[in-house]
Amino acid sequence: MHAALITVTIDPGKEDEARAMLDAQVVPMVRQAAGFVAAYWLEPHDGKALSIAVFDSEENAKAGAPPAGMRPPGSPVFVESVEFHNVMANA
């Protein structure tokens, strides 16, 4: 399994809008991605939020994660960085 560790910045005062977008668009889209295993979105802190999305292969992780530097049109979220890691263990 491979994980995508994603760091995003949320525009100040737009946390509720970002959460609504996450629930309505991002979560359903990620669930349908090829090789999807699990994903976790962590609550924002100081305008930054992290997510971890786990896929069955590195290829699917790279295909299912957003590119760094992306801001969807009209979105209050900017994708700062995306890292890919092999999952060593889970519980």
Say what each PLM segment does.
Residues 1-50, 56-68, 76-91:
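Short S/T/G/P-rich N-terminal loop/turn motif that feeds into the first structured element of a domain
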